[in-house]
Amino acid sequence: LNINIFPLDKHSYTFPNPLYSDDQGLVAFGGDLNPNRVMIAYTNGIFPWYNEDDPILWWSPNPRYIIELDEFKVSKSLRKTINSNKFEIKFDRNFVQVMNECKKIREDKEGTWIHEEVIETYTKIHEMGFAHSFEAYYEGELVGGGYGINIGDIFCGESMFAKQSDASKVALYHL
């Protein structure tokens, strides 16, 4: 059991090597959600994930789910939905609304890690040009989508929501 969890200094944006994370991927705690700190974290394979009113926790799980675009397979049913052009797909039109939809607590969940401080930080990162939303609209209404951070050739998806079946999947496909 690895228990090397490092405290972060609010005045330094230095992160420990993710190889020092615990068995669940927790690598550090503390610091703040300054957009520059968050971007440095992402470039080091680390991201914040914590409940409101708890200390900020910084994670780097191994293994991590990765979608290799050249190996991405679309199911027949999803392909049918994509080809139907049922949804209008847009990007970065309603970033904050997408985050707020992702924030809504699902019936089978106790809470959400997406709270106002997270929304404020990711909105600033969006304004910096690194956070993006992908959106599916049906008859002019936002019905699915998600958001994440883009660094070089890597997109780190953070959360998705769907008010209609396959809406977020179709938007993700077009990403």
Q: Language-model segments: which ranges?
A:
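N-acyltransferase acceptor-side catalytic subdomain
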Residues: L1-L175
